[in-house]
Amino acid sequence: MEKIYLSDSGPKVSPAIYGFYRWTTEAPNTQATMEKIVNLCLELGINTFDHADIYGSYQCEEIFGNLISSKSFKREDIVLFTKCGLRLPHSTQPGVRVKHYDTSSEHILKSVDNSLLKLRTDYIDIFLLDHLDPLSSLEETALTLAKLKDSGKVKNIGVTNFSVFQHQLLASYLRVPIVTNHIELNLLNTAALDNGQVDYIKQRYMRPLASAPLAGGRIATGTDEQAIRVRRKLVEIAKKYNADIESIAVAWLIKFGALPLIGTTNEQRIRNIVNAFTLDLDRQDWYELYDASKGEV
């Protein structure tokens, strides 16, 4: 996979990104599974990996860091995302009673240092805020992010699940560019195409980063009316391209410039997503799928 710029401010990333947002460390042999998945991604040309402090019950970063320290691959050959902001109750977080958001300076600085330690690295390529915390001072948050970038601990700044206005609001306080906004976007959730999020991302010369590109498996196995309707259309169009429905679903995202954020541990699904980059849906096929999603068939 040829690397591309995430925004006009950089950095270069693989066109597909692997994220650990669906991982659970309760599964057996988590480290062996992660090593297998990471090696598969690298083999397929995916060198960009998305983390958060909370993923895998606050343990995924550390497991990935073990892979870095074991020299399974070179740190300079991969691009690392991580994020903070969402806080969840867990035995390792005794002060957290309820799910809440925290983008205070104190929490951001502590989270970055913890992530660097767990990931066994001295810099994060892209650090993201997970949602906007209405109780934190935006000026303080922006100054903290700029300080982290100036220190070299963080190379770029991004956000996750920000509305258009939230994106604009934080950007107005920042003196460094926001290079990405992770948004949920797939054939079963096209809201970002209709509410201005995708348009604003493009206006800022960024690429939409689509999390849950297969809708958490619903595209292939969902039993609700929308999933069945979209899957029927995917099967029809897949025959034309001699491809599977998952590849077509991701090709639909790629067509308007979105980068799929993969979360599955199913190796064949990862390969299907990568295969989507060999397809080029024609305009009318794209709109047929869009209409099927909205129930306008």
Locate each region found by the language model.
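Short, acidic/polar
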Residues: 28-41, 103-119, 167-168
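Alpha-helix N-cap and loop-to-helix initiation/capping positions
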Residues: 29-33, 59, 63, 96-107, ...
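N-terminal binding-site loop/beta-alpha segment at the start of enzyme catalytic domains
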Residues: 1-78, 122
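Beta/alpha (TIM)-barrel catalytic core signal, keyed to glycine-rich beta->alpha loops juxtaposed to Asp/Glu
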Residues: 3, 132-297
